[in-house]
């Protein structure tokens, strides 16, 4: 699997690995790259079955497969230890990596993630799947921004929304791959496994996330006693895209705390 590595800003710079959500594209993290690359060597990648790692995914594809193929790609690149920053599905992959490879994962940042699929999120995906079956890729792509962005933010950026729609349609991962990746997402359940996450964890969520209610991050925070939860008042599911200045400040401060504070952080900030 192909991955992209930025030049290290200094010798022995720590490595952060960015994992996108269901869309799978490494470009999702573009608003964070410039800030992160000043302090870290950054790994971005398109997930298996998407972008420049396209190809038909097998039946029974799992979250474990997603974590294992990324871990192997990192080892092949000479990266045995790293910090994970994951959004939604990417946060789940990060949890899986932290459990399966505890010596490799230095710290973990979960953005709008969850322990197990919330009933509201399941309902959203059921609606989106019906759109996919009824209207194909066009309907899926047209509906996607409604679950990602706040209404006012979208309304002020109509040309951008049209451009994003055209780009997403041109690079659509394919119905089979999408459904297999979505099934892996829906089947993931960390309620019994969270106790095996021993690395420092930062949790970031947005109160106006339409797709993943912020209560999911509250539950994740409760299951990871040493975690630090930060709540953004607005930004939607893709809060790192809609309010990158706020998000980047929270992320950089959180990373510094995770990597340099040897004691677990129990404070919840809002």
From Swiss-Prot:
Biological process, per Gene Ontology: nitrogen utilization; uracil catabolic process
Domain of life the protein comes from: Bacteria
This enzyme's EC code(s): 3.5.1.-
GO molecular function: hydrolase activity, acting on carbon-nitrogen (but not peptide) bonds, in linear amides
Catalytic activity: carbamate + 2 H(+) = NH4(+) + CO2
Matching Pfam families: Abhydrolase_1 (PF00561)
Alphabetical UniProt keywords: Hydrolase
Domain AB hydrolase-1: from-to ranges: 14-123
InterPro entries, per the entry: AB_hydrolase_1 (IPR000073), AB_hydrolase_fold (IPR029058), AB_hydrolase_sf (IPR050266), Pyrimidine_utilisation_RutD (IPR019913)
PANTHER family: MONOACYLGLYCEROL LIPASE
Similarity field: Belongs to the AB hydrolase superfamily. Hydrolase RutD family.
Functional summary from the UniProt entry: Involved in pyrimidine catabolism. May facilitate the hydrolysis of carbamate, a reaction that can also occur spontaneously.
Name of the protein described by the UniProt record: Putative carbamate hydrolase RutD
Annotated organism of origin: Enterobacter sp. (strain 638)
The encoding gene: rutD
